[in-house]
Every structure is written in C-alpha cells, then in structure tokens.
Amino acid sequence: NQFAESGIKSVRFVGGEPFLLLSDLAVWTKRIKELGMDSTIVTNASWGRTKESARKALEMLPDLDNLVISSDKFHLEFIEPNTVKNAIEVALQYGKNVIMNITYIEKEDIQYMMQLFGSYRDRIIIQMVKTMPFDGSEAEQIVKHCYFQKPHRTPKFCWIGNYFISASGDVYACCQSSIGTETNYLTLGNLKEERLPDLISKAHKREVYRYIRKNGPRGIVKAFLESPYKDELMELEFASGCEICQKLLNDPDKYEYFLKYIQEE
C-alpha cells in the first residue's frame, strides 16, 4: 500500500531465490496488481527442473507480469540449461514477459550463453549484464577502467531512485548503496520506524541524493578531481559507475570531503 502511495509503478522481488517463498509471492503479486502496479520476479529458474514443476509454480502466480531469469556460466554449474529452458517456455505459455539477464566477465561468456539460449531471441528479451565486482579467483578477469584519467568516459546514468528494500525493512536509494554500511551515504531509513512516502520525501531533500541524481557517477569523479585524494585515485580502476560511488562514498574521510564539496558548490 505504501509503495502505491509513494507513486511507485513497479515492484521487483530479488533474492536469494524468491521462488522459495512461492505462497507469499502469490499474495504479494495479487495485491500489487490490485493497486495498479507492475510486478517482476528475478529468479535463477531452479523451479523449472521439469515442465510440470514449472507449471505448478507459475499456476500460483497468475498476477505476475514479468519474469527475469538470471543466468551465466556460474549458474549453469548448478542449474542445467534445460531447467532454464523449461522455465522460459512455460513462462511464455502462461503469458509472462520474459527477460533473460546474462551476466558476463569476458566476451567468450556471451558467445557460450548465446549458443545455448540464442534461439529464444525472437520471443524474449536477452540482456547482457556486466559482472559487478566480487571476491574470488575470477575477479581479476573483470574489465575495469581508470575513470579519473578520462572523466568524460565516466557513466552519468545512475540507478538512484530505484529503491532497494531489504528483508529487515531497511530502505536504500539504490541496490549498490545497500553495502555502504560504513557511512550509510544513501540509507534512507527503515519501514518499521517510518512510512515509505515519508522516507522518500526526506531523501529528495538530502543534498547527497540530489547531487547524485543530477550528476551521477561522473559528478562524483568531477568532485574528487578537485580533492586532496586526486593523485591516489588516478591509478584506481573501477568496473562500473556504481563501484565509483560505493568505493568513494563509503569511505568516511572521502565522504566527509564529498559532503563539504556539494555544500560549497
């Protein structure tokens, strides 16, 4: 109810794996539809081991609008391609809009995944999503850029305003800021303490929120090019604009500088 009151048009369930809470999803997607909003579930498609199991799952979700299937070479080590294909085919039979997010590190990953799922391109949307930074043996393969050396190449687009709500009720201005726990630079509050419309209204008045929404990651790079941290940042590599924001603004000292910068601008 608070989502609709806040003017939110679409609600997306992510995990973990949301289909583990299938009965709850049935209730939530029904209410979302009643309130005139759009619903999406992001899933690994593990419930599609057979077409029958896929049908049983989707029969419980008649009000679901969109299904985002997230897959990559890593997922396929645990979830067979046929399981993913079953989920796609049954979802199409039930009239769902199907989007497949293929996460990749190298271009070869895209080629491999398209060999498996490319035949669906005329029936679903297939999106290539660059892997976000992570810790692990393959982390060094992620392509990164020295954005401070070429600030004009820094992305200006930002996902701020696509609010992320955790299972505990914490509200963040975007997904990436949910790991910004050192400074809570875009933590908006908690639904158990305040209503969502009030949290969003307060967020729109915060200088940090307004600056990032207007200028995006490119504006953050611009701000720090005039800082005492300029030299150390010149050699740093970032995989995305989101990582720029999270790495710099979740550092207490750099965040303090940033606050002073935007107040003086």
What are these regions, as identified by a protein language model?
Residues 99, 105-180, 215-230, 239:
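A C-terminal junction/extension of Radical SAM enzymes
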Residues 8-21, 35-52, 61-83, 97-105:
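Core AdoMet radical
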Residues 2-5, 29-34, 56-64, 86-93:
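Acidic (Asp/Glu)-rich catalytic clusters
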Residues 25-26:
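Short alpha-helix within the catalytic core of nucleotide-sugar-dependent glycosyltransferases
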